Amino acid sequence: MLQQVPTRAFHVMAKPSGSDCNLNCDYCFYLEKQSLYREKPVTHMDDDTLEAYVRHYIAASEPQNEVAFTWQGGEPTLLGLEFYRRAVALQAKYGAGRKISNSFQTNGVLLDDEWCAFLAENHFLVGLSLDGPAEIHNQYRVTKGGRPTHKLVMRALTLLQKHHVDYNVLVCVNRTSAQQPLQVYDFLCDAGVEFIQFIPVVERLADETAVREGLKLHAPGDIQGELTEWSVRPEEFGEFLVAIFDHWIKRDVGKIFVMNIEWAFANFVGAPGAVCHHQPTCGRSVIVEHNGDVYACDHYVYPQYRLGNMHQQTIAEMIDSPQQQVFGEDKFKQLPAQCRSCNVLKACWGGCPKHRFMLDASGKPGLNYLCAGYQRYFRHLPPYLKAMADLLAHGRPASDIMQAHLLVVSK
């Protein structure tokens, strides 16, 4: 069968280690996905599946487009360095003359000089999970034996910097860390971090369907389910982002790049680049599990969202399937009336469907749990975003806003 090219731009993220991880972070939503593959005690991608993934992904991409490989988990370093050497060799084999990039999300525990030299030499972009100072990070990010991991992650950060690896830091914002935005932000800045992404931690305890599948956390959908004790509160997530934005705009514009601010600016000026959950629709970013199974989204790895298997179907067939088309379009079609009439709709777009388990003001389902936080954040930003857009339009750097005095009238 000839490989088809999907009708629109897409992205595939691979999980070569499946849900296997060397840590036991309390809030991780992926560890329990091992229950979906009970027949396989070890969920690591074999060489045949690796080659199929690389070959199919490159073939499914338009020749003029960059092919962006993303490796995640579980913990992708568990596959060992040789696995990624083979991956890079396969990319060269099947992608001769093509522009290819690699990104890699890790907890950093297994990184050493050899790993970092490889990552630098092959221009990998590394996403390092680090939640802030030790007392915040160690509360939930622990080893299988319950030991703290902060020192190990800071060692990894030092190694990445030593080898000049391109990296960013991924910060999970939970109920505790949401109380200390500037402590988290300043700690990262003091550690030399320049690129930061803040991720809200929101999970519910499992419903009956999920329990039958051996899961502890609630599957997306419906309005049932008790929140976990570590889930961030909506208002506090909004205040967390606002506090960091206000701190950043006074001293760090052009020096520190906070992705949550970058996405908001992109939507404000009508430019591409906003993350999927702040786009009108989704469904163009799928994941490949260790055995070639393809799922609708990283947050929707459940049997009902399985699109097929790469060994039997092309990537194009699965991404352009009616099932996936409906999945992506429902992000907009199922917005409740409260969202459609909201004055920050075009900044928020309802957020991730996974978090839409609340009732809106009229009692209709589909409101995002984080709605109050998003409203607080997105209503705070426009005067500043407009000022930066105006500066850029006049050929001046956005950082000039740090010398400006804005009169912002609260509404």
Which functions belong to the PLM regions below?
Residues 21, 25-28, 276, 282, ...:
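Disulfide-bonded cysteines in secreted/extracellular proteins and peptides
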Residues 301-411:
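Flexible mid-to-C-terminal extensions adjoining Fe-S/redox cofactors in radical SAM and related proteins
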